[in-house]
């Protein structure tokens, strides 16, 4: 396995080096270096609030130390349920209690019994390897962005109707910009910790990465990947001491505003609501519809499920129906569009209430181990990978964790965490 990894990283490093040596990228990085210096020495930068702005937030123990604890997934899930206009059914209430209990046991209790050995045995990853992989992923995503736009003959943000013409086989590689950003940001975090760049330089590079993500993902008209990029930068920056607590709180408010705003204007463009409708009501109605879907899925799934893994397996490319289209078919609604089933929708349909308890426990354990590993090592890579899986767990509260590339991210994280568990136990 180490031979395969070494061969792949060596090849990717060579590709990355060749691109960096090219005239185009030499010019780009020279210009960016100039802009970075202007930013650091800018007069306007001094007008920006200091790290101690809204200092009362730092006195809150939960915000300062546990804001991105894995339990935030349960908090977000609870808020999402409260947004709905109607209440949950009695059966779904039991399912939710099992889900919350399983997740809590998985993330808060079970990790205490692991990774208590010698931390020197924990796997270490080279900064250059992670940067090169991230850089190449971003390049691939940019190439497929232009291919996707050309395939539909326009920019989906400007023509919302053509967004549904986008082909998943072309847009899926575009979303590689998310893990690419995660790895490159983690590499910059390593540079900052090694004092190779200043905090101001690290902050500028984080902002630039976020700007690139916003530019490409927003033009495609996708909201969830855009929020993923935003969350990843915030989480890595917070645990790397690059982003202050008050910026996290303000960023969260901006993120909520973006969710409401993008959803509202998209609905206006698609004529599903009028301009007289409240943006808050638009968010509530979306949450209410998703909760209604979950109520139906819970009724269908029962105690032991009906599809027994077929919904999760439908995430694999080439399946007749994707998992969210399968949801539409199961609830006898519309099979030609995707329907979001929430974080536990797939679990309850595949394996029922029993499956929800077990799968939420597994998800909680993955996040709990990732959180513990990040805290013990303070390592740039483990900070990045935790940010990646926590981000998609939070966003999965509405959408579910059903996209094949996201499942691959979790599979990689599980593989790395298991190796570390075995190494530290021995």
Describe these PLM feature segments.
Residues 1-122, 202-215, 229-269, 412-418:
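N-terminal "leader" segments that precede or initiate the main folded domain
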Residues 62-72, 129-134, 197-206, 374-386:
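Membrane-interfacial loop-to-transmembrane alpha-helix junctions, especially the N-terminal start
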Residues 88-90, 215-223, 396-404:
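Membrane-interface helix caps and helix-loop-helix hairpins in membrane proteins
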Residues 106, 181-188, 234-235, 239, ...:
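Transmembrane alpha-helical segments
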Residues 160-164, 249, 256-368:
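Small-residue-enriched transmembrane helix-hairpin modules in multi-pass membrane proteins
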Residues 206-207, 227, 249, 357-358, ...:
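Hydrophobic alpha-helical transmembrane segments
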Residues 336-345, 349-426:
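Hydrophobic alpha-helical segments
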């Amino acid at each position: 396995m180490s031979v395969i990894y070494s061969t792949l990283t060596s090849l990717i490093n060579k590709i990355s080096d060749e691109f960096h040596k090219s005239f185009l990228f030499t010019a780009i990085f020279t210009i960016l270096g100039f802009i970075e210096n202007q930013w650091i020495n800018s007069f306007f930068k001094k007008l920006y609030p200091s790290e101690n702005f809204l200092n009362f937030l730092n006195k809150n123990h939960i915000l300062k130390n546990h804001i991105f604890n894995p339990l935030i997934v349960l908090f977000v899930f609870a808020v999402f349920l409260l947004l709905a206009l109607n209440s949950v059914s009695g059966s779904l209430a039991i399912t939710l209690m099992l889900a919350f209990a399983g997740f809590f046991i998985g993330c808060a209790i079970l990790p205490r019994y692991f990774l208590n050995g010698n931390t020197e045995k924990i796997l270490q990853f080279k900064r250059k390897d992670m940067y090169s992989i991230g850089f190449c992923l971003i390049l691939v995503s940019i190439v497929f962005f232009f291919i996707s736009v050309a395939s539909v003959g326009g920019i989906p943000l400007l023509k919302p109707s053509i967004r549904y013409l986008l082909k998943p086989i072309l847009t899926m590689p575009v979303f590689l910009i998310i893990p690419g950003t995660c790895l490159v940001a983690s590499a910059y975090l390593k540079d900052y910790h090694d004092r190779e760049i200043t905090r101001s330089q690290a902050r500028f590079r984080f902002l630039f990465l976020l700007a690139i993500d916003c530019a490409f993902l927003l033009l495609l008209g996708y909201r969830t990947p855009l929020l993923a990029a935003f969350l990843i930068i915030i989480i890595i920056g917070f645990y790397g001491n690059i982003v202050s607590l008050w910026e996290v709180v303000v960023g969260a408010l901006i993120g909520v505003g973006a969710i409401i705003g993008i959803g509202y204007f998209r609905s206006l463009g698609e004529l599903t609501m009028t301009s007289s409708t409240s943006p808050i009501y638009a968010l509530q109605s979306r949450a209410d519809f998703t909760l209604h879907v979950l109520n139906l899925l819970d009724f269908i799934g029962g105690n032991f499920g009906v599809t027994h893994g077929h919904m999760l397996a439908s995430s694999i490319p080439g399946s007749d129906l994707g998992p969210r289209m399968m949801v539409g078919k199961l609830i006898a609604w519309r099979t030609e569009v995707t329907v979001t089933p929430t974080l536990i929708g797939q679990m309850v349909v595949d394996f029922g209430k029993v499956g929800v308890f077990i799968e939420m426990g597994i998800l909680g354990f993955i996040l709990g181990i990732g959180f513990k590993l990040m805290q013990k090592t303070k390592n740039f890579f483990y900070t990045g990978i935790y940010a990646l899986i926590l981000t998609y767990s939070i966003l999965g509260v509405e959408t579910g964790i059903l996209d094949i590339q996201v499942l691959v991210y979790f599979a990689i994280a599980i593989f790395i965490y298991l190796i570390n568990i075995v190494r530290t136990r021995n």
